[in-house]
Amino acid sequence: MNYKMMGRFIAQILTIEGVFMLPAWILGLVFGETTAMWSFVYTIAAIAVTVLILNLLCRGAPSAFYAKEGLVCVGISWIVLSLFGCLPFWISREIPAFIDAFFEIVSGFSTTGSSILNDVEALSKCLIYWRSFSHWLGGMGVLVFLLAFTGEKGKGFTMHLLRAESPGPDVGKLVPKMRATASILYIIYIGMTVLNVVFLLLGKMPLFDAVCTAFGTTGTGGFGIKNDSMASYSPYLQNVTTVFMLLCGINFSCYYLLLLGKLRSVFRDEELRLYVGIVLSAIVLIVLNLSGFYDTLEETIRHAAFTVATLISSTGFATTDFDLWPSFSKSILMVLMLIGACAGSTGGGLKVARLMLLLKSLGRNIQQTLRPRRVQLVRNNGNPVDEKILANTNAYLAAYVIIIFVSFVLISLDGFSITTNFTAVLACFNNMGPGLEAVGPTCNFSAFSTFSKLVLCFDMLAGRLEIFPILILFTRETWLHK
């Protein structure tokens, strides 16, 4: 294990975090929020000291960097980012309990959007900004940001890190160099964010609100800056957010292909077509089920479309209390929470690509049972899928199910209902945000015990990092062997 290389890398990640805290510190100065502003000063100072120590201890690090280091580095980096990222909330005492501050920022970086806050609007503006920015940074990935804007280092450095942090069953190159791929993804991501801000400003949303909302939308994080999330905003602003949530649930590679003029490749993409089909089907079924629930058809369609978009993209904004909807509609929403967005997007969940591969693999197994001598390949977009990817998908599904049920049992010690516990785990592990009943869109996670909050923090990080970069931190083999 190349510990020195990992230490230097974590120092770079912390440096980026410290730099990104500067705008929040400036906002604290502008708004005269003295206590909150100084909390950022102390945090940045703590980061600077830690970075200095790591750089001194890790001088002369070997350049070799392999898959195991990549996975471990990603897992540790996100934990360290969260430990330092929560300090402004805790030092300012705006979130007095450290575990609550840690839960809040883990929810931010993992783009979950679950909160322990009873009154979001009581937070200082600079802390609201940092809270919202955390899930924008976590959306595409802080490590992807580092790869996009620094040089390549060491053997396999970029590929191992991008593979470990990127969502989906496989990491593909848009261009030959992985650094260039990371740069393209971030440029598209920034462009989507700016475009989202512009459309929100056209709807007369205040600039601060527009920026924070765009962070939550493009990062599919869903931290609202108002206690009612998006409910108090105009229908236009809600519709704009619906569109951008759905767009950010699409594989970002599709946008690169669009920029290259490869429209046919985009429209023939099987995952995209399945994603669109699921979205449209869910909206139609929920609208039919909600007949008479709202005053007008327009309101019904708007809330149905927004809620479908917020859950399948794993954003977590809300315009209505969907916990009051009929059971059929809530069942559809739970299915969307499980499926999630497309691979290569900023969304969470199992991913549409994995669902597609699992269904095709199941179909192949049925055919082979009926015709044992028949050789049949699983194909995606006309190309054969590597058997290793199928095996990894099956392993991911097994780990996915096990973690959900173990977490469900563990947090059940708090005595909440089965629905509350199950949807709380689904919301955190799939990076959704709200669940049902006691963790519904008008509630929060503050009532859970410290132990349950730690379990849910594990779920949020494991869900965002596709399980294994977090899971391997708890295995002996990771630390015993070279």
Model regions: which residues?
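Membrane-proximal intracellular helices of multi-pass ion channels
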Residues: 1-482
